[in-house]
């Protein structure tokens, strides 16, 4: 049985794994947004105030600022995915590796996983604990938790 500290760590690892697809989708959405010709009209940053002045930015400046922000978001999300992929690569030879895909990427229930691999439901919980234990050091090394 996992200790309270292990449960907290496992929960953090699971949160990162469940978020993987969200990062992939966000990158795709941001890339589409960068290619959108209506980009300037969708985001209005007309005036900035400071030191008693009102600065009105041109449409080109607004577009460039928005593109820069989107590119920064894409870069940040790609970095997170890269670190997750590196951690997963370290355990890919683990006999229970396919549990990660079934549970966290395909969102199968423990019952569905048990049926799929032909084990008792309680065994899937043991498999989860084993695979998350194997991932723990790699997630810490990659500064994901």
Regions inferred by a protein language model and the residue ranges of each:
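N-terminal interaction/assembly modules
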Residues: 1-90, 137-145
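N-terminal positioning helix adjacent to the helix-turn-helix/winged-helix DNA-binding module
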Residues: 80-83, 94-96, 127
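Short coil/turn residues that cap or connect secondary-structure elements
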Residues: 88, 92-95, 123
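Short amphipathic alpha helix immediately N-terminal
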Residues: 92-106
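Short alpha-helical "recognition helix" segments of helix-turn-helix
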Residues: 112-117
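DNA major-groove recognition helices of helix-turn-helix
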Residues: 124-135
């Amino acid at each position: 049985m996992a200790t309270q500290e292990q449960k907290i760590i496992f929960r953090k690892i699971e949160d990162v794994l469940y978020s993987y697809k969200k990062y992939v989708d966000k990158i795709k959405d941001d890339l589409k947004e960068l290619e959108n010709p209506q980009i300037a009209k969708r985001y209005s940053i007309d005036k900035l105030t400071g030191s008693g002045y009102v600065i009105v930015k041109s449409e080109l400046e607004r577009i460039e600022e928005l593109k820069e922000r989107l590119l920064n978001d894409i870069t940040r999300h790609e970095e997170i995915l890269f670190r997750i992929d590196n951690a997963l690569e370290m355990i890919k030879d683990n006999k229970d590796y396919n549990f990660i895909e079934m549970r966290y990427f395909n969102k199968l229930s423990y019952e569905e996983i048990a049926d799929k691999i032909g084990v008792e439901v309680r065994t899937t919980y043991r498999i989860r604990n084993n695979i998350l234990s194997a991932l723990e050091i790699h997630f810490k090394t990659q500064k994901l938790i």
